[in-house]
Amino acid sequence: MKFNVSSTELLKGLMDISKAIPAKSALPILENFLFDLKGNILEVTASDSELTLKTEIEVDTTEEEGRIAVPARHIIDLLKELPDQPVAISTANDSSIECKWTSGNSVLPFFPAEDYPEIKGTGDDAERVEFPADSLIEGINSTIYATADDEIRPAMNGIFFDFSPESTTLVASDSHKLICYTVKEVKTPEKCSFILHKKPAAVLKSILGREDGAVEIAFDSSTVLFTFGKTTMVCRLIVGKYPKYRDVIPQNNSSILKIDRAMFLNTVRRVAVCANKASNHIKLELKPGQMEITAQDLGFAIAAYEKISCDYSGDELTIGFKSTFLTEILANMSCETVVMKFADSRRAALIIPSEDDEESGKICGILMPIMV
């Protein structure tokens, strides 16, 4: 293998996929990048066996093609210290590569590409769909915080992608809160779905940040591929059945609170400072035209109270919530005005953007109350 490439371009490509490199692995070969040079394209692979990232880097000149595995940490650390300049990389012998730059060089070990595990993709029966990158990023951002850490029910540890002929909905829940994010322009001929674990979802979100086109998604019963720009992400899906989330969305909550989202969020945060740190319990007392928010920690003899104006219609209601859950939902909405719909103090509240907001119909949250 022998090629010349910009140090900056090589570093950028490696950093984009380095999130898949494990800190330590039962398979030490996975602590390496797999370099595959064909013509003037260097395909680089990083994997932890569950999550694989591939990218293509255009090199300036190629004198000898080849495939080798290169220590990820060493080559990244070296490139980080180099200013932007051409770098010549070549195999020096059967076990090492040489990196030459303007004023010096470095020798690193490499390992046979044959030792690198084969990365399997999807089968011939894979479903395929295009997803706008900005909508996918927003959908993951809007739901990932609601995923669970549940060893008994692994399906709850990921984001559920629910495709249909009408729309696509991303869903996440930890049994205390549930978030749905709907993208109406993404549709499939028939209903289909998959569950993406929160870890690859977070990686996908971070590397999608610079994309503004469409993401091609292909998936079967066990694997999903995301392709965008020069990058491909391959990961295993969570196998299992996701709960029937639509059945728990309240339909007839008749008591309605309409309030400025930022004001509500800031008030809850202030009052929650005095909430018990174990329960994070706050209490909302709702009456037409006003809402009182209180919290206390009897162990430390502290309490907080604040009254704010609001648009509320319905019976007077006293209801308790875990403040951290309520602030998470409010903070991850971008609407100006939020609507909360209640049935009573024991049943879940529905949290949605106001009907006149552009976010209306796109996102909804469901939050279980706690005993007052």
Language-model regions: role of each:
Residues 1-372:
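Structural preference for solvent-exposed beta-strand-turn elements
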